[in-house]
């Protein structure tokens, strides 16, 4: 007998418990995210190097314009004057996300993996633009990643979709989760979901090379749940 009665509940909506993460620079493609969405699950795309991704998909020239503008700094180790063009970031973000969400055909959702550390000498302004543009373009959810994201909610608290879009965080530390939740409570905007990463997840984690021998995902999840 096949039992198929488990569903993921987020914001009053039911999903098949399939969540595919968003590996950056278009490794987790629109097509992959849409395949998961068609099945009723949650597919992620990433906004890492979104200008480059748009260039590949739409033949735009965000990358070449930036390279030309800052050509003098290519061989200069001091990149303090190299900045993201915030208008272009917003434009590319909206174009890429609209392109993806407009192709939805199932009952699932398209979320964005938004790494806090993707900045260029203007951390706060860059992150705010990325998050706001994603919501403007109709993204179903924001998964905050690659950092403590202590100010991420503050940056978008005035956006009209602040309580409408699903918001979650990827976490690998009980302490980091507790700090994030303290901020979230202050803004009356608790996360809709929490993704627990262990030492085998790879990426932006706080584990050492041998920690995989001392931690398992089940125990880590229980620890994080106790904080919630």
What do these predicted regions represent?
Residues 227:
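Conserved small/polar residues in nucleotide/adenosyl-binding loops
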Residues 1-224:
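Active-site entrance/lid segments in N-terminal catalytic domains of soluble metabolic enzymes
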């Amino acid at each position: 007998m096949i039992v198929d009665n488990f569903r993921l509940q987020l914001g009053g909506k039911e999903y098949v418990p399939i969540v595919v993460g968003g590996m950056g620079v278009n490794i987790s493609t629109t097509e992959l995210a849409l395949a998961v969405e068609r099945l009723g699950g949650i597919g992620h795309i990433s906004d890492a190097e979104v200008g480059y991704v748009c260039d590949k998909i739409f033949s735009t020239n965000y990358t070449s314009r930036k390279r030309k503008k800052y050509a003098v700094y290519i061989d200069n180790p001091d990149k303090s004057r190299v900045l993201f063009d915030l208008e272009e970031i917003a434009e590319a973000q909206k174009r890429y996300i609209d392109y993806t969400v407009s192709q939805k055909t199932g009952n699932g959702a398209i979320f964005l993996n938004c790494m806090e550390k993707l900045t260029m000498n203007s951390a706060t302004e860059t992150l705010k633009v990325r998050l706001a543009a994603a919501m403007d373009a109709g993204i179903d959810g924001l998964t905050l990643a690659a950092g403590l994201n202590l100010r991420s909610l503050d940056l978008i608290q005035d956006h009209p979709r602040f309580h409408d879009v699903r918001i979650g965080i990827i976490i690998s530390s009980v302490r980091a989760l507790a700090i994030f939740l303290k901020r979230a409570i202050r803004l009356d905007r608790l996360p809709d979901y929490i993704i627990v990463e262990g030492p085998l997840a790879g990426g932006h984690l706080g584990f050492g090379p041998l920690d995989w021998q001392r931690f398992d995902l089940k125990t880590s999840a229980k620890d994080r749940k106790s904080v919630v």
